[in-house]
Amino acid sequence: MMIPSGECTYAGRKRRKPIQKRRLTMGAEKSNPSKRHRDRLNTELDHLASLLPFSPDIISKLDKLSVLRLSVSYLRVKSFFQALQETCVWSAPALSPEEHSYRGFPVQEGRLLLESLNGFALVVSAEGMIFYASATIVDYLGFHQTDVMHQNIYDYIHVDDRQDFCRQLHWAMDPPQVVFGQSPHADTDNTVLGKLLRAQEGGKGLPSEYSAFLTRCFICRVRCLLDSTSGFLTMQFQGKLKFLFGQKKKTPSGTALPPRLSLFCIVAPVLPSVTEMKMKSTFLKAKHRADIVVTMDSRAKAVTSLCESELHPKLNYLAGKSNGENGISLFRGQTDRSHWARALARSSCLCLRGGPDLLDPKGTSGDREEEDQKHILRRSPGAWGQREMHKYSYGLETPVHLRHLNWSTEQRSQESTTKLTRQPSKNEPSTCLVPHGSCVPYPGSQGMLSASNMASFRDSLDHPTGAYCSQMNRPLSDIHQGQVDPSTCHISQGSLGSRIPLTGMQRFTARGFSTEDAKLPSLPVTIGTPCNPVLSLDVPIKMENESGSQDIVEASTTSCLWLGTSDMARGHLVGFPARMHLKTEPDYRQQACTPHLGHGMLGTNPYSRDTVGSCREHAPLYSAHCTCLDPEPPHHLFMCSHSESQHPSLDQDCRAPIVKREPLDSPSWAAPGQVTVPRMFPKSASKTVIPSKGSDGIFLP
């Protein structure tokens, strides 16, 4: 039986046996031979129907043709199993008949196996006849088992999928064209099928070289009575082609035909969506697309920073690829040996002007550092979560070229202040000078820098530099470091380092982008330029008890350090007892940085004057991205100092201004001449070491 021609018709609900009306006999009637024949035929059909393996309520609904069709189908199935037992060698059952019973009742293993399937069993002959369909077909298609047995399979397949289903029934997926009067078997088919049949009859099984040709897995649309929308349900057919023994078919001339390959498969529905599923198990089936395009939620796209155009031609693993914004960053830079060096971020670098530069002196990644890092990772449960989040950034694909920046001063007449302006000049690489007696920075320490040139660190300074790590971003082991050419060393203005990095010092640009593109607000250090942009660790701090409000007002008006934030807070100045106010009383020096390193970083201020007892205002030191303890970064710095102008010698050490630490607890600090709110620092600010007496200097970034 092949694909039906003519108009496309699909199988529907079968016609049931009509209810016969019985007339009451009124006495003796004349006998009718035709009626007696029909009665004998109906009696035989009823007896035949009673022999079918169905329940009485199902049998009572069957018409005469259905009883004959099901009887033929039952006999064919029985003949198949009898022939299978004769040709195949069956091993002895592992369990005895007594063990197949539960509490004296036999266990129907076949029914339990069918119920466990996420689908139904189906056997289709080579002619397209449904040889067998399990009773569970009614749960998926709405057809009862008695409706489909020994029926044409193409009546249930969508018209667009019938040719594909016909190809699946052939061993080479190339069925021959059936011509009237000729055998459907070609010479090639007879040769291959004969070889397969002899191998299986001999008990050897199917040859391995033909196993790939006999495996089937395809999808077709099948007629479904349970679907009220389209009437079809997409089903997956998965199984193999096997010989259907015991059919004993013959040609028109009477020659017996060999067994034909038939499709033995499990038919499972391909469910369209999760909300429409009616499933017995947790296994799902889906039809994959060829491009393997991943679909993402809008929230997932926001996290991964990917759009539809980026996801369309990509594979699934690219959708969740890291963009380097979260987790642990990997810095990558080119060394002087023309190879790339990678290193993990040691800590978060808190700089005065927000420059994302990180300086790591050579030799800090020693054995003791690795031991300290492992010890920190063992005692910190949160560090293991960061260890699993390795994210790599490949922003530095080219060597970093630094751009030399010139700084000039610009006087503002209205506010009587001096403003720094940055002017670009020629792209000349800056060189680093190794000074004598400079302080070695602690890049692992978590510190705070203020405009008053005070650096406070939470960690003690008793351990070597390699033992320090930031509490915000703990370092991990296995750091591959490389060295950068010292001729291109670059230090950010107000960074944690208090001097120029040594020769062989490592420099990595944070977040994986180049320095030139990021436009870092920092200064290239040239030869002869002092590189103490911040106050060194030796800052003298003077502690005094609280005094009267008059003393506070007088002290704040004569010699105070005011860090401006905004003019809105002038009338709302409130003291906080938990915070301390830091102010400086420096002796003015013409140069603002370490004198033994050369000329001043900012140069001599042409607008500066030496006055006695007057307030001198210097350049604004803070940028909009300053990292300090206060919520808002300051914009300007106004410094008042006494008159004493001496140019220190080049051999003197850099000294810090004397910082007085006083409590701020009264709103009477707001003097008429005050323009901004003083900076607040908590009492828990770390103390620093007091150096020996000497000439003082003012440190400007």
Swiss-Prot record:
What does the record give as the function of this protein?
Answer: Mediates dioxin toxicity and is involved in regulation of cell growth and differentiation. Represses the transcription activity of AHR by competing with this transcription factor for heterodimer formation with the ARNT and subsequently binding to the xenobiotic response element (XRE) sequence present in the promoter regulatory region of variety of genes. Represses CYP1A1 by binding the XRE sequence and recruiting ANKRA2, HDAC4 and/or HDAC5. Autoregulates its expression by associating with its own XRE site.
Q: Which SMART domains match?
A: HLH, PAS
Query: Gene3D superfamilies in the record, alphabetically?
Result: Helix-loop-helix DNA-binding domain, PAS domain
Instruction: Tell me the Gene Ontology biological-process terms attached to this UniProt entry.
Output: negative regulation of DNA-templated transcription; negative regulation of transcription by RNA polymerase II; positive regulation of protein sumoylation; response to xenobiotic stimulus; xenobiotic metabolic process
Q: Does the keyword NADP apply?
A: no
Q: What is this protein called?
A: Aryl hydrocarbon receptor repressor
**Cellular component terms (Gene Ontology):** cytoplasm; nucleus
UniProt-annotated stretches for the region Needed for transcriptional repression: 555-701
Q: Which domain of life is it from?
A: Eukaryota
**Pfam families named in the record:** HLH, PAS
Per UniProt, the keywords (alphabetical) are: Cytoplasm, DNA-binding, Isopeptide bond, Nucleus, Transcription, Transcription regulation, Ubl conjugation
What is said about its interaction partners and assembly?
Interacts with ARNT, ANKRA2, HDAC4 and HDAC5. Interacts with ARNT; forms a heterodimer with ARNT.
Species annotation: Mus musculus
Q: List where in the cell it is found.
A: Cytoplasm; Nucleus
Does the keyword field hold Lipid biosynthesis? no
Composition bias, Polar residues: 409-430
Enumerate the GO terms in the molecular function aspect: DNA binding; protein dimerization activity
Crosslink site: Glycyl lysine isopeptide (Lys-Gly) (interchain with G-Cter in SUMO2): 583, 660
Q: Which SUPFAM superfamilies match?
A: HLH, helix-loop-helix DNA-binding domain, PYP-like sensor domain (PAS domain)
Instruction: Report the induction information.
Output: By 3MC. Up-regulated by 2,3,7,8-tetrachlorodibenzo-p-dioxin (TCDD) and beta-naphthoflavone in pituitary.
- The annotated region (Disordered) lies at 409-432
Domain named PAS: residues: 106-176
Which positions fall inside the bHLH domain? 25-78
Instruction: Please name the gene that encodes this protein.
Output: Ahrr
